[in-house]
From Swiss-Prot:
Protein name: Mu-theraphotoxin-Hhn1c
Role: Neurotoxin. Selectively blocks neuronal tetrodotoxin-sensitive voltage-gated sodium channels (Nav). Does not affect tetrodotoxin-resistant voltage-gated sodium channels or calcium channels.
Taxonomic source organism: Cyriopagopus hainanus (Chinese bird spider)
Record comment regarding domains: The presence of a 'disulfide through disulfide knot' structurally defines this protein as a knottin.
Positions of disulphide bridges: 51-66, 58-73, 65-80
UniProt keyword terms in alphabetical order: Amidation, Disulfide bond, Ion channel impairing toxin, Knottin, Neurotoxin, Presynaptic neurotoxin, Secreted, Signal, Toxin, Voltage-gated sodium channel impairing toxin
Amino acid sequence: MKASMFLALAGLALLFVVCYASESEEKEFSNELLSSVLAVDDNSKGEERECLGFGKGCNPSNDQCCKSSNLVCSRKHRRCKYEIGK
């Protein structure tokens, strides 16, 4: 009787440890996943801030308009505009 009670308690303790370990791994995984998603969002925001969009004020000597969108800084208007013909 004492042996069976001891085995039952040991089994419950082992089950508790295994469940707790798997639950903490799931939490770590979800935290890592969430932090990686947020890191991707932060990187995309950083890229958006590096260049100026259409119609934004700019300095022709330091052209910061988005080259990927074919924008250049107009010397006349000092605004980002689309470059036509290139």
